[in-house]
Amino acid sequence: MTPRLEDARILMYSHDTFGLGHLRRCREIAHALVAAYRGLSVMIISGTTIAGAFDYRVRVDFVKIPSVIKLRNGEYQSMAQHTSLEDTLEMRRAIIRQTAQSFHPDIFITDKEPMGLHGEIEETLAFLKSQGTHLVLGLRDVMDAPELLGPEWARKDVLRKIETYYDRIWVYGPEGFHDPLAGLPVPEAVTARVRYTGFLRRAIPKMGTPAHRPADGYLLVTTGGGGDGADLFRAVFAAHRHDPGIGRTLAVLGPYLPARERAELLAEAETLPNVETIEFDNRLEELVAGASGVVGMGGYNTFCEILSFDRPALIVPRTQPRLEQAIRAERAAELGLVRMMPAEDTVDPAAFAAALRALPDAPRPSKSRAAAKAGFMALDGQAQIARDVGEWLMAPRQPALRAVQS
């Protein structure tokens, strides 16, 4: 029987400046929690422009904050043409703070950015800490190379602030796969709060109907939001021109692919009889499940879907502005979970075509004895998260006596 938690509330923060990964991860966790506990409500604060394009379960809702986009050089800009970044950030801070004050969450979960975009949630964290709210930081299995992440966090004094505010740090991966904080001067108090949840299992959604129902047996090419995916799509299309016998390929371009590159790719795809392109599908899980192989860049959500549906995969990771995808792909390839191809090797159409042709017959992740022995295929992240949440919400709440001084 599903336990009932009367009027329990969880607020999640997803800064969403590049791609769809943060919102999709928050949504997956939110759906698992409301399924585990009747009476629980989850609100997601999201900055993505297409938050409303996804289906949400009953008792899961979202608050849209003004959108900011991360450029390829790592800088940020407001997506409102006539609003400065500073003004946009101030609006975001105000909405986040007001939502926290009005929603009265029992638990606040931050996705990936400990203090939010440009520190926009620090004031809210201090307020919630003073109210006795349980504060949780959720981190991907891989953040970035320590030589890149370390200086960035040092400038922002992030580790001290994590120690000050957060009660628990979830790592959304299994212990032993990768330590996202490796190489950083992590305080012992922070290390003691870390819990590895395992990867987040994906399933075919029960809500709504898919926008696209291709027959099974296609290669699926996905780069997530698509903001930096043009080079991979060009390489796939060049491979098809070199070898038209690769077979049916479905390319999901992504809603954030720049308009000029989108137009060029759509025009090129029209000349390739075995290539179909779509912009977006909010049920990507169904497309992954039906594919004979998946070609992607190795973002967290795509990787979890590859494992969940046990699809042969070829990963071509990006290396700018972060090394996250490359680190994950190298580790997964080492374990035999995926095949990896450096981006510079895909510029050879013959070599890339051969890799695409071979992909459907490549070993599936479930064939990796090393990963199975280590427990990396358990994919039980949602269950571990739900256990933690249940323990906190069923325990007597102890309000803090004073506000935290930042």
Specify the residue positions occupied by each region the protein language model found.
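A nucleotide-sugar donor-handling region in carbohydrate enzymes
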Residues: 139-231, 256-259
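A short, glycine/small-residue-rich beta-strand->loop->alpha-helix junction that serves as a flexible
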Residues: 14-27, 51, 229-230
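A donor-sugar binding/catalytic signature common to diverse glycosyltransferases
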Residues: 283-327
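Donor-nucleotide binding loops and adjacent catalytic segments primarily
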Residues: 184, 199-293, 345
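Conserved nucleotide-sugar donor-interacting segment of glycosyltransferase catalytic cores
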Residues: 97-163
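C-terminal amphipathic helix plus adjacent low-complexity
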Residues: 350-406
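Conserved nucleotide-sugar phosphate-binding/catalytic loop shared by glycosyltransferases and other
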Residues: 6-14, 32-87, 91-93
